């Protein structure tokens, strides 16, 4: 194909720049791929060095049979693996809605030259259609999927061109697995958002409005970034192995900055170990049980902005250090994209930069990235079993363990309670640090993979100090004795951070963009206005689209409030053909009144 590309092709490249990469090295030798005529008139197939990659008799019939055997919904993401049958591309494309996602994947880059003009170019003109050729394009495919909004996606349909797949079975099998895994993860994230997004927004707005409120002085993690450069950190989690390591922690206390997950706090305090910080992430109030009955007045609480407001309002800490959970993705255009927790935009409009922390879904993964941001290196993991070591859920001494002690009877032991919990989980065996195998579950295994992937990208070592938990790849799995030898090469830290504002709250000086009092006042005014507007009986006569437009207009600068009813919006969008206009209105208006009443109540909680 000539470098002098037609205007139509250049227009497509303007919208999908990555496609131009396939034309940078036009082969000078005869192509091993050719478009050949089939026995049936007006039908073609691709051949590779004379080998047909589709039916050489009736490729169109083959494609129609394949597409007819798959029921494709308008909310499905569709992928074709192997492009040896051009008719399959055209038949699938014809079944899809404009904007519906179609991914065309093949191991060979040179396929683009015989297929582009007649078969691929018309498809690539349509938004949502994408082409990934060659192994080097796979990172782009994974990045595209990771950054893809899945609110309108209900599932994935993968069609395989058998002749193409048979040439590179490993490549296509791995692509198939990864496609399903990423989409499954995205759907899981979406369900999590649907479940908790309303709570995240509510908590973020309430915590922002209460930023200067007593009893706890508050600051931002941004002010502590890289202040601990070169200081070893000890991240303490509440795995079953923790109780065996507490005596060791006391011996190396002066060498490390100790960050405790909220779950492990009670265990450390029982051994007389006062951590330098506590990490909490849970947006639900039941996490208060990790702190009840403990003296935390000397310890700063590192709290994600979505953390439960009653904990920050009713318990006493040295200070509260806020952060925001955000992840960074490379989208299909190659640009870095920041995806922060719902509610963060409004918070940053008042507080300024708060500080981003990436999370793998657990308190420990969040604390790990937070320690990296502080500049701590290396990092020692303790109690990070990520497994049911000894068939236990947590170390003894945690809140869960204390609660179970009240349930003990002659017939009910701790072992029986632990066993009942384990048997409800989706369990599997994974390699242990002992060289044997240890029982874990699906969620704990996800966290393990997160640590393994994160450790790959770091320029300092991670040590997993554990004697019975799961083996974490890309880290050094060691015992306490070896960890002590490593730490002996570091000087005592002298607790220099005690002079930082988070540990010396009397010197905290926060330079805010605006006033929290005005923030709360304006927010309450917007809430009352929207509630009043949608309580009018005449709204029940208007169309859903009119109500949606009115709602967005009434939000003004408070775009984050839309997340309160996003679950309802997406539900209506997914079932737009099944719900009548009356039901759509009822769902939408009731969601607005319910969520905005709840937010108003939370904002006013604790006021005298």
Predicted regions span which residues?
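Class I S-adenosylmethionine
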Residues: 1-77, 85-91, 190, 194-200, ...
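Gly/Ser/Thr-rich loops at beta-strand to alpha-helix junctions
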Residues: 81-89, 108-111, 136-139, 162-165, ...
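Acidic/Gly/His-enriched mid-domain segments of enzyme catalytic cores or analogous surface patches
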Residues: 107, 112, 116-197, 269-377, ...
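Acidic, Ser/Thr-rich peripheral helices and adjacent loops at domain boundaries
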Residues: 121-129, 279-284, 292-298, 321-322, ...
């Amino acid at each position: 194909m000539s470098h002098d590309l037609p205007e139509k092709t250049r227009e497509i490249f303007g919208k999908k720049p990555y496609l131009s990469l396939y034309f940078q090295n036009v082969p000078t030798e005869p192509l091993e791929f050719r478009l050949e005529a089939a026995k049936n008139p007006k039908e073609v197939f691709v051949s590779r060095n004379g080998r047909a990659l589709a039916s050489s008799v009736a490729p169109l019939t083959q494609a129609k049979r394949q597409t007819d055997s798959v029921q494709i919904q308008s909310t499905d993401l569709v992928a074709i693996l192997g492009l040896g049958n051009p008719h399959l591309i055209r038949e699938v494309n014809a079944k899809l809605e404009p904007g519906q996602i179609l991914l065309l994947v093949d191991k060979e880059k040179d396929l683009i030259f015989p297929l582009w003009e007649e078969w691929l170019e018309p498809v690539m003109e349509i938004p949502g259609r994408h082409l990934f050729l060659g192994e080097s394009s796979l990172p782009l495919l994974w990045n595209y999927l990771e950054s893809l909004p899945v609110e309108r996606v209900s599932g994935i349909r993968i069609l395989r061109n058998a002749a193409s797949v048979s040439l590179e079975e490993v490549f296509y099998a791995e692509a198939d697995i990864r496609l399903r895994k990423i989409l499954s993860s995205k759907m899981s994230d979406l369900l999590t958002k649907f479940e908790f997004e309303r709570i995240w927004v509510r908590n973020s707005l309430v915590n922002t409005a209460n930023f200067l409120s007593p009893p706890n002085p508050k600051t931002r993690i941004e002010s502590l970034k890289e202040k601990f450069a070169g200081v070893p950190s000890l991240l303490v989690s509440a795995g079953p192995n923790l109780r065996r390591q507490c005596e060791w922690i006391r011996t190396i206390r002066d060498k490390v900055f100790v960050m405790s997950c909220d779950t492990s706090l009670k265990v450390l305090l029982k051994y007389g170990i006062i951590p330098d910080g506590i990490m909490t992430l849970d947006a639900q109030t039941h996490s208060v049980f990790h702190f009840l009955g403990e003296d935390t007045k000397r310890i700063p609480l590192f709290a994600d902005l979505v953390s439960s407001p009653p904990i920050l309002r009713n318990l006493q800490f040295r200070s509260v250090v806020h952060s925001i959970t955000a992840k960074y993705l490379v989208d299909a255009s190659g640009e870095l994209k920041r995806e922060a927790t719902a509610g963060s935009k409004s918070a940053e409009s008042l507080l300024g930069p708060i500080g981003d922390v990436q999370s793998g879904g657990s308190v420990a993964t969040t604390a790990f990235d937070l320690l990296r941001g502080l500049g701590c290196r290396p990092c020692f993991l303790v109690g990070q079993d990520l497994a049911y070591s000894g068939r236990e859920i947590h170390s003894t001494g945690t809140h869960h363990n204390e609660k179970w002690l009240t349930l003990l009877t002659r017939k009910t032991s701790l072992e029986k309670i632990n066993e009942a919990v384990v048997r409800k989980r989706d369990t599997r065996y994974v390699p242990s640090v002992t060289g044997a195998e240890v029982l874990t579950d699906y969620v704990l295994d996800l966290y393990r993979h997160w640590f393994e992937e994160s450790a790959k990208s770091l320029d300092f070592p991670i040590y997993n100090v554990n004697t019975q938990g799961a083996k974490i790849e890309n880290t050094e799995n060691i015992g306490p004795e070896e960890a002590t030898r490593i730490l002996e090469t570091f000087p005592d830290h002298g607790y220099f951070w005690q002079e930082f504002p988070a540990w010396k709250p009397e010197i905290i000086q926060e330079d805010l963009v605006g006033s929290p009092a005005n923030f709360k006042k304006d927010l309450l005014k917007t809430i009352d206005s929207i509630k009043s507007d949608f309580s009018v009986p005449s709204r029940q006569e208007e169309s859903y689209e009119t109500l949606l437009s009115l709602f967005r207009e009434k939000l003004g600068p408070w775009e984050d409030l839309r997340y309160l009813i996003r679950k309802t919006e997406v539900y209506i969008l997914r079932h737009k053909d099944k719900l009548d206009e009356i039901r759509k209105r009822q769902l939408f208006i009731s969601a607005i009144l319910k969520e905005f009443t709840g937010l108003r109540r939370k904002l006013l909680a604790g006021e005298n």
